[in-house]
């Protein structure tokens, strides 16, 4: 959620920055300003009436002592009470409307981001070189099938399109990747948190995914008197609610968390021909990084998260690039995002395996997550997140980049202690 004080003081700047994200917010900003003015007027009117009520309540005993008729004053007080109740009801309506409009606005992009979408994304750096084969390479679907790593057919039989089964060395390779990610993060000082996979609506609201993207997740059928729950689309949705409605101290920050979870997404729309196999699916495994920081720490925290993700991919020996996203390609909740994109040879391009983002205080305002400074004042923390990493594109890249002419796959050195072999073969 944006800062309403900032909107009121800088409406034109807010409009211009939201326009960089492709959002024409003229109507919403006008609504916010009008509703805020009405809200302040209603509060002032209520306070004026209450002041008059207090004055009259002090007069009544004096008038009674003087033997004067106080019935007119009681009648007036009753009318004032009715008016106050009427104003309070209107104030509740205005507050609800104002909150609804505020929740619908995306985050402001950082000033240095280019406007527009993917066409304006900026590659910042490359690592390694694209793999060149002296034989006809296979794609990851054929490799995983031939080696018995992934069972696509039975995955579809069990759950439909967009699902797969890890088998044998495929399951062990997947588990090796996850262990490598988790162990590296723990070594970097992050706390491992295993969160519920079913979350309440407030988690999606705090993360900024709801209400706009509420239909992109899988909702559970619940009884009318039960709390509504959904399957988490990413551990970020849970981790950024860990400190919802809490006030932390400066000494508490930064808080650094990681969590391994399966992620569940509807992935509406048709799949492109090059996205077959594991590249897009309804369920995949991911390790997520989240930090809570002081505002002045968040730029350094962002650089740290990007480096963490890059180093994981470097450790696997892959060719990849880091891309600074243009404003419109950043998600609604984020002020800036860098993607780490890995090369998958059969797809003739790069696929994102990590998005690292800074939400600034946008999520903290939605979830009332604050820090009490040493001087006693409170302010909103900053929240950041990043994939560290998702496996559903790492594994395809691994088998394609590390394949050999005989159809076997070389296991990256960092994974060998987890999987126990150097080469995966039939």
Regions found by a protein language model. Give the residues of each.
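TRNA-recognition modules of translation machinery and tRNA-sensing kinases, especially anticodon-binding
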Residues: 126-426
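N-terminal alpha-helical targeting/anchoring segments
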Residues: 1-131, 145, 149
């Amino acid at each position: 959620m944006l800062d309403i004080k900032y909107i009121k003081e800088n409406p034109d700047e807010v409009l211009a920055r939201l326009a960089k994200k492709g959002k024409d917010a003229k109507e919403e900003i006008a609504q916010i300003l009008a509703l805020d003015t009405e809200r302040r007027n209603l509060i002032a009117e209520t306070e004026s009436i209450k002041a008059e009520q207090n004055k009259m309540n002090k007069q009544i005993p004096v008038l009674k002592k003087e033997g004067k008729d106080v019935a007119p004053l009681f009648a007036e007080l009753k009318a004032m009470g009715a008016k106050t109740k009427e104003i309070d009801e209107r104030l509740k309506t205005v507050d609800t409307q104002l909150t609804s409009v505020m929740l619908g606005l995306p985050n402001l992009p950082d000033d240095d981001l280019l406007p527009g979408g993917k066409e304006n994304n900026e590659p910042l750096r490359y690592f390694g070189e694209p793999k060149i084969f002296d034989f006809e390479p296979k794609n990851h679907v054929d490799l995983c099938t031939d080696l018995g790593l992934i069972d696509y057919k039975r995955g579809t039989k069990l759950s439909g399109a967009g699902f797969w089964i890890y088998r044998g060395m495929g399951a062990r390779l997947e588990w090796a990747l996850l262990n490598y990610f988790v162990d590296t993060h723990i070594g970097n000082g992050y706390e491992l948190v295993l969160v519920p996979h079913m979350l309440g609506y407030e988690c999606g609201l705090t993360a900024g995914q709801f209400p706009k993207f509420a239909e992109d997740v899988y909702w559970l059928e619940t009884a009318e008197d039960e709390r509504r729950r959904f399957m988490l689309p990413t551990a970020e949705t849970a981790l950024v609610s860990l400190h919802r409605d809490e006030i932390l101290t400066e000494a508490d920050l930064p808080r650094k968390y990681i969590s391994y979870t399966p992620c569940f997404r509807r992935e509406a729309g048709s799949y492109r021909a090059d996205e077959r196999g594991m590249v897009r699916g309804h369920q995949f495994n991911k390790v997520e990084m989240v930090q809570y920081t002081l505002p002045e720490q968040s730029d350094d925290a962002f650089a740290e998260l990007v480096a963490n993700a890059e180093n994981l991919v470097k450790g696997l020996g892959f060719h990849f690039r880091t891309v600074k996203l243009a404003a419109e390609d950043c998600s609604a909740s984020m002020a800036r995002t860098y993607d780490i994109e890995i090369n998958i040879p059969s797809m003739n391009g790069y696929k994102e395996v990590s998005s690292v983002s800074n939400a600034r205080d946008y999520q903290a305002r939605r979830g009332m997550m604050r820090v009490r400074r040493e001087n006693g004042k409170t302010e909103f923390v900053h929240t950041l997140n990043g994939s560290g990493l998702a496996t559903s594109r790492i594994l395809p890249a691994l088998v394609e980049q590390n394949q050999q002419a005989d159809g076997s796959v070389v296991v990256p050195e960092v994974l060998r202690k987890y999987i126990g072999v150097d080469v995966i073969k039939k």
